[in-house]
């Protein structure tokens, strides 16, 4: 999971180029600049002139502006740039931005500044006060010089402004450019000679039939071991180019073609790692925009190179090559996503969820049909609109056909005029995936031959890094020399660190990544052991050479990595007992490169606390699992676990720096090691049962922390590994119930995220950003949810895991399976130096069961291929390219396949049998609710069971219970009123196996003192009538009201009969100036209204 900067991986190439003296000084055509300069006016008119205007040119605003007088003649006003060279037959693009203070159409042209005033471009742009960006592309039909001669006027760009408006107006111009497509190579034809091109590593060239042909001998480990190169090409950052050539290869053979740096770091502006060539000459054309600048000369000039080195012999022929500038940037990458109905292309288990996603803008449900292999409709229904799925920026519907249980192959879903890719319904779907995912690790072994008798001829290869030339490792490896990022550390010993697994697409071996990978392989076996399915991983089940030793094959594979990790322990000195962080090449190598052909020197890197604790954890884990098969090795592992634990305690903050990832290998930098301490303590406790390790576990700040985060766990965040093992491996840790509950709670969070996902994924990272290796984050989240099912038997977790797996196998934004060999359209060109069939047909593709890294929306981490594919960005779950040089999205690595291995083994155990019915068990009890009067109270209850239980809510009615009409969901909502105060409720869950009631809960309406909501108003009334006052108040219990009266500002006196919110009193002469108020009272308090006065009108005399 490390950046494989193969575009900078030129350490070996440097020596090759120096030896073959390819750094030739070129004299290529200068980089095509606009013949009119930069075209901006920040520094003045820049050679532009005006005539007939009302005043001089004005560039004070950064644009060139002129005032056009009223009533001007058609040719009487203009803005002109003279001295513009134009070449007949050349294609140009004129670009500019212009405005006019009044709506007007002007004349813009490229032509002659003199008779006969010919033009090669003549246009009439309509302008307004809003800036208009104009682009005109044309091929010149004449030649105009930059300097005028007799009868040969100079070229010009002119804007004729007169005669187009009766009123005075202002014209402004900015960002003017005239670009042409310029050939940058001085020699483009190979009909007769190489010209300034250099050829090496091939036979002598033969020139015939308008082309050059050479024989390649084969046996070349690097693409650059043979090549055709021209140095001296100027390349500019941000400029666009088109590279084309006509070539052939017999037999068919892809070659590596690049535009890049002919020295230094050998960076590339463009690279096509596998330009396909066949026996028939064909023209290949590649448009690109450079993100780098290379000069035409110096120690690292720009170059065009064909790297021809291959393992097999072949003939290469080429007739022409061209590199031209282009005014038009190439379009972005548009993936072929196939039908808009997205399914798990592998299929579905008979008794599990079966959902698909339809990408559609339809606002209403869409009809769907499920068809069998013969096209017969076996089920139908309508979709559920889900709105826009943010991770894909696509509007989606969900199709649910879970009720179909009939097994069969070749099913398809049809909806909205689209037919899905085919899939199966079969209980044995994933049995082979269990083995494919685990078989990846034998092929990743270092230090041993990969035997054809075990894996077949396609994947067989020589042992890598066993001290046989050209290898310089790994039997006697020194420490890296002093580096600033290691504070000058080095060592004076050498170690035999052969063995182990190659980490990813390179030849490096890393303890922290190997640690999580071997840990998950051991977890895969230990889970099967406790689930009663260990026979599925027994001796003879995997493609490994240890068959017949009565040891489960997955443990044989884990042992290979464990023994290598033991060899990485520091033997002596200040850091004795610590573990070296990694071993890898001292410089990057290119692709393809078999391990046995790697010529780089190797070095050990400084120990780290993280690496030391990784070994402590997996050595303890391995000790308990290998003890029945090899007690001596188990004892060695346990002793190493203790030793490294103690060493980490002594050096708790020795971190791997990020700067250590610049040369030859990834950094795997990690300065947060509390999680490694927690994991190691957990494994040591589970193996030994010792109180000291139990204490280390329970006192860790991570023991009660939420370690199951939205973005999942990985090599840099391993506390989840310890928590999962503590929850599942039998032990007597205090508070074990809480540990197990934390796993279930973490899984519930993933279920909540899945409910909002249009593609059913369990991965919902913070901010929606998909990380490097997102496929493994998906897989690790599946591990958590599947473990929750193992702990509880709750069918929700089983269903969520099965549905979450759909994402990896094609139910996603790209309609793409990320597991090689699994699904109709699956990743098969992952970044690897030896699974590199895309670059060399004699090499294999990644093996079936290889998990690709998957979408990565972190643009700062992108490789050049991915950057070129998405110049304008991409929806997070669509940032993926199945291309071997796209290492930031398409790498493969041991810790990603270890996660897949665990999940594959779990899902294979689910089989085809219908789940055994189990009675409902309440998993979430409702709780009492106290809410304000008029508010809604909600009660939620959940239960597990097989089949999934139905739910109905009941309310206490007298001495019995009565169903609440329509209340059949897991949440009940009740309005808080005086009538519902004190009401009791419960949920009843029922399935075929039984029924269970939840706890009884009570709704309580909050008590509240009276609050006046209506004050009485003053009243003016005639004698002999009645005056009416009104008041109101809220409160609970409902307040009582008593009206009061007073005269002349005296004391308030109650009116005993006035106990309504309305008071009606007779109006008499004596009542003049009387005041009234209402007093509201309940058990909580009292509130009085503002007083209201009665004004008496005397009767008319």
Swiss-Prot record:
GO biological process: cellulose catabolic process
Domain Ig-like: 918-1006, 1008-1097
Residue ranges of the region described as Catalytic: 329-880
Annotated segments matching region Disordered: 838-865
Recorded superkingdom: Bacteria
Record has Repeat as a keyword: yes
Keywords annotated in UniProt: Carbohydrate metabolism, Cellulose degradation, Glycosidase, Hydrolase, Immunoglobulin domain, Polysaccharide degradation, Repeat, Signal
GO molecular function: cellulase activity
List of catalytic residues: 506, 831, 882, 891
Presence of the UniProt keyword Transit peptide in the record: no
Family: Belongs to the glycosyl hydrolase 9 (cellulase E) family.
Protein name: Endoglucanase C
Organism: Cellulomonas fimi (strain ATCC 484 / DSM 20113 / JCM 1341 / CCUG 24087 / LMG 16345 / NBRC 15513 / NCIMB 8980 / NCTC 7547 / NRS-133)
The organism's taxonomic lineage, starting at the top: Bacteria, Bacillati, Actinomycetota, Actinomycetes, Micrococcales
Gene transcribed to yield this protein: cenC
